[in-house]
């Protein structure tokens, strides 16, 4: 009798090289290894040990975490922090020395790795993608297994094109119905985290399923998988479907001709089999979800915009009660305050979660004809997104409203 497999099972089996201990870690093959300016020490370690990058064509370097988003005509010299400048330059030097592909600060397709990779079609169903950044979970939107790795793992992957990984448990989150107008994938994932908690997905790979998930665009799916780690999950995944294939068909690095037909046949075999089992299940009704706002400092400290700041003293979980009290003090909020009455200090539109063209279109539609009353900046996720937005006149909408229009980078997420 054939065992019903999940999407994750299939990818795991395809990439497992060895597993000396059935209950221990497995050695997995890595299709793409993504690095940014931060893990320069991994390249230093290789150099000191006399080793080279095992497969340079499968390591991709992105200048994104510490690149300046203003005065870009000056290149890395525009970075006010000498350490940041050095890391940007080191990445370029390491990429040149090891012959890996590098989207540097002056590259016409420069941007945040988790925006550039998908828009170029580098992420494809069935792949295993590792990255020196926790939001590598983004690639799960394509039916790939994407996850972040630590310092020593980056060096190991550079040297071997493989990684030791303990098999996680599996969770399925099924979202039925449809999201209401004005409710986004960001609201959906915040509602999920608010329900299951920031540790609710710990030790699991999450597969998102259901009619509401199928109705999402690829960019919305990326937002969902990008934030799956915020509930402690090792990765978030969505089975590939016609929406996935249509998106990839337009991408630069997608297979072409006969290779496309062969890839498509393989991709169609990946969705979880009927009857496949999961270690945990959660169900949500998309129609009941409203726009969400985080009132604290963790993503599970979230309530609908129509709600009020809660009183942590009423929380039954002692850890959440303590965290909530600390968060309220930090945020200078009082229990019972209506969220709609809370003033904001500044606005940031961007990041690998929401710096894509759909996000900018949505934001511009709300900003048009209005004026910002607080400092506000918009940072497109990539140069391609920036050019597309400018071609549509979105930059003018933001600028006329008093927003700063900047160059791509991680920006406020990394303090750069």
Describe the predicted segments one by one.
Residues 1-416:
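Fe-S-dependent hydro-lyases/dehydratases of central metabolism
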């Amino acid at each position: 009798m054939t065992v019903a497999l999940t999407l994750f099972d299939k990818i795991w089996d395809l990439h497992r090289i060895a597993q000396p201990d059935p209950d221990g870690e497995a050695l997995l093959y890595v299709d793409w290894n993504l690095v940014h300016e931060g893990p320069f020490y991994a390249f230093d370690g290789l150099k000191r040990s006399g080793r080279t990058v095992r497969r340079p064509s499968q390591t991709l370097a992105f200048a994104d975490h510490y690149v300046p988003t203003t005065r870009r005509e000056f290149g890395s010299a525009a970075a006010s922090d000498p350490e940041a400048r050095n890391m940007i330059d080191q990445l370029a030097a390491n990429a040149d020395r090891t012959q890996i592909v590098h989207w540097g600060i002056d590259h016409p397709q420069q941007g945040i790795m988790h925006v550039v990779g998908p828009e170029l079609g580098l992420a494809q169903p069935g792949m295993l993608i590792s990255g020196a950044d926790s939001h590598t979970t983004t690639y799960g939107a394509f039916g790939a297994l994407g996850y972040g790795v630590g310092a020593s793992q980056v060096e190991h992957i550079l040297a071997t094109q493989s990684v030791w990984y303990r098999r996680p448990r599996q969770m399925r989150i099924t979202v039925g119905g449809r999201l209401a107008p004005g409710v986004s994938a960001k609201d959906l994932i915040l509602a999920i985290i608010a329900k299951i908690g920031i540790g609710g997905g710990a030790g699991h790979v999450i597969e998102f399923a259901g009619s509401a998930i199928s109705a999402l665009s690829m960019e919305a799916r990326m937002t969902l998988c990008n934030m799956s780690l915020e509930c402690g999950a090792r990765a978030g995944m969505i089975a590939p479907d016609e929406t996935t294939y249509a998106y990839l068909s337009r991408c630069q690095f997608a297979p072409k001709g006969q290779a496309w037909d062969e890839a498509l046949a393989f991709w169609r075999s990946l969705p979880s089999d009927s009857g496949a089992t999961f270690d945990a299940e959660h169900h949500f009704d998309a129609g009941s979800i409203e726009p969400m706002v985080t009132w604290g400092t963790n993503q599970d400290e979230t309530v609908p915009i129509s709600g009020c700041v809660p009183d942590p003293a009423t929380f039954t979980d002692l850890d959440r009660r303590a965290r909530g009290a600390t968060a309220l003090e930090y945020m200078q909020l009082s229990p019972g305050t209506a969220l709609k009455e809370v003033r904001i200090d500044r606005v940031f539109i961007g990041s690998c979660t929401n710096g894509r063209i759909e996000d900018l279109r949505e934001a511009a539609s709300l900003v048009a004809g209005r004026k910002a009353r607080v400092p506000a900046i918009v940072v497109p996720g990539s140069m391609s997104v920036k050019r597309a937005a400018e071609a549509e006149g979105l930059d003018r909408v933001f600028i006329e409203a008093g927003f700063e229009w900047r160059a791509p980078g991680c920006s406020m997420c990394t303090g750069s």
